[in-house]
Amino acid sequence: MQQLSLLDSVVIPDTAQLRAAELRRLLEHHNRCYYELDSPEISDAEYDALFRELQVIEAARPDLLTPDSPTLRVGGKPLARFSQVRHRMPMLSLENAMQEDEIRGFEQRIRSLLALPDTVALQYQCEPKMDGLAVELVYQDGLLVQASTRGDGEVGEEVTANIRTVRNVPLRLTGDNLPALLEVRGEVYLPLAAFQQLNQQREEAGEPPFANPRNAAAGSIRQLDPAVVARRPLAMVCYGVGVMETEARTQTELMSQLAAWGLPVSDQARQVSGIEGAIACFQDLQERRDSLLYEIDGMVIKVDDLRLQQELGEKSRSPRWAIACKFPPRQATTRINEIILSVGRTGVITPVASLEPVELSGVTVSRATLHNWDEIRRKDIRVGDRVIVERAGDVIPAVVKVLLDKRSGTEQELPEPETCPVCGSRAAREAGEVAVRCQGGLACPPQLAESIIHFASRDAMDIDGLGSKYIEQLISLGLVKDIADLYRLTRDDFMQFERMGDKLAENLLAAIASSKQQELSRFIFALGIRHVGERTARTLAERFGSIDNLQTATLEELTSIRDVGPAVAISIRSFFDAPANQTVLQRLKAAGVAPTVEEKRVGGRLAGLTFVFTGTLATLGRDEAKKLVEAEGGNVTGSVSKKTDYVVAGSEAGSKLEKARNLGITVLSEDAFSKLLATGGNQ
């Protein structure tokens, strides 16, 4: 008699479909019991048996694999790169409070803005400030369809495949009254025990350990291979929403609603009355900090009433209704064995203390920044000193104090360098700066290497595969002396490397060639202009539309742009005025490097005007409408404030329309918006 295989026993269509649905339900239920409720109902072996059964069914019947299947949590195929995602509403950062008086000042500002007398008690929601990576999840009709990192607050990276591997993130929401669209924000983190285990595994494998749990979480989520992420026991906690229609009246009710839908929220969140109640909650959390199973670096205080949150609104980078109360940095005592001089991409020579290793926040610290020579003189830091070090923000170790009473008299001062420790070029300060810089420019190997590494990096020209190892070899072989030389490389150049095959050389050349058509904002950022980060580069690209226009921009034109102050404008102008840089740009153009951008008109019809869109537009998508405004020099934001000039209301407009009317802001129909685009308001 022929023996039936396991596949044969589960391919009956109706039975297989019903069983797969039941297995998905059971696995998600047990996932939640284990990861959220900490109350497992079955053994690991029983869970694995259910999981394997579902895998077998899906292998036999691929048509039964659903987007919310728990089997997707093991990770899929590696990605070539992350795509960018623009958040519908900006993911703002929070203002910080380091002292209790600053926390009280937070309430005073709120009372002033709301014209609230002291007799009216404000309610707050207090929650731990997780030390992880901020992400946004998008659910449509209850199904997880997209996940992205915070990025710069406006644009992040899509990490959906990686987030699906985070065990306490529901792939499908449960419960009643699920919204058609839900954007939920939260923090992905690595529990402390898992962090220590991961670092032990990395050290055993000869890999460098992560500096802290936050870096481990961020590095994991930005892994291109979801299978690697799936092997790391990440977790997530939700703290707020972006786009969502809600009947909740308070932040506390909103978090309860998210929990009812199966989303993980903090079990440490508290609702308190008055700012003194919030301060007491902060003090209590600080005392209990070391007993928690995860790293936190403070507490977030939020006005609990959602209506008041809406009324308070946001500043350009942070909401007015929330503040992050930071814990004092943890400290330890150690000895400075040596002071090492490090040369960075822009030539800054930074003194770094080599320390006797000391344990700090669960991490072994052996180096600490000394910042600059003004700081060294101010603190009277010498080689051989006993010092107090702290992890500022619990991330970057720094020397904060010298224990003068521990001096023996043998300690040695470190003079300010007059020459570069690497290339020997003259080192000097520039007017108004504390930094000492090597004047060797690209003749200085660290500056050359770092400038090319930056140029090729993922956030800049994104030349896939061209990492620091290959760049250093290119420089040592004399094949690359500036960024333009990258576009002259040949297959034979790469074949000089050890263990370089034909296929890898072809891939590197293809990656370099494809970067010739990179976005203008990335190209501007890649040039490494001092003070020009990704956000400013994007603003410059939108404003000028081409590198030629930016090259010829005057100081007056530059300083008129948001995000560009006098120091940034001078830095931009100095960069483009330098003959060496002009030569490099000419060579890049000759090599076919032609950055692309949808041109944004300088002094366009809508220049200086700020728009907010709400509801559904009949003839335009939201992104298309945004591009039209920006192409005419206008700005689009996600929230209504007194600085908003126009609110464009489509069908099913929400609370933004009501707020606009309350503030007396002009509300436009879609037709009126189209006419404004055509005329710029000049009838």
Curated annotation (Swiss-Prot):
Binding of Zn(2+), residues: 420, 423, 438, 444
E.C. code: 6.5.1.2
Domain BRCT: 601-683
Annotated catalytic residues: 129 (n6-amp-lysine intermediate)
Top EC group: ligase
PROSITE patterns linked to this entry: BRCT, DNA_LIGASE_N1, DNA_LIGASE_N2
Any Gene Ontology biological process: DNA repair
UniProt entry keywords in alphabetical sequence: DNA damage, DNA repair, DNA replication, Ligase, Magnesium, Manganese, Metal-binding, NAD, Zinc
Molecular function, one GO term: DNA ligase (NAD+) activity
Gene3D superfamilies noted in UniProt: 5' to 3' exonuclease, C-terminal subdomain, 6.20.10.30, BRCT domain, DNA ligase/mRNA capping enzyme, Helix hairpin bin, Nucleic acid-binding proteins
Required cofactor(s): Mg(2+); Mn(2+)
Alphabetical list of InterPro entries matching this protein: BRCT_dom, BRCT_dom_sf, DisA/LigA_HHH, DNA_ligase, DNA_ligase_AS, DNA_ligase_CS, DNAligase_adenylation, DNAligase_N
Residues reported to bind NAD(+): 44-48, 93-94, 127, 150, 187, 302, 326
Record carries keyword Ligase: yes
SMART domains: BRCT, HhH1, LIGANc
Substrates-to-products reaction catalysed: NAD(+) + (deoxyribonucleotide)n-3'-hydroxyl + 5'-phospho-(deoxyribonucleotide)m = (deoxyribonucleotide)n+m + AMP + beta-nicotinamide D-nucleotide
Family: Belongs to the NAD-dependent DNA ligase family. LigA subfamily.
Role according to the record: DNA ligase that catalyzes the formation of phosphodiester linkages between 5'-phosphoryl and 3'-hydroxyl groups in double-stranded DNA using NAD as a coenzyme and as the energy source for the reaction. It is essential for DNA replication and repair of damaged DNA.
Protein's UniProt name: DNA ligase
The species this protein was found in: Trichlorobacter lovleyi (strain ATCC BAA-1151 / DSM 17278 / SZ) (Geobacter lovleyi)
Gene: ligA
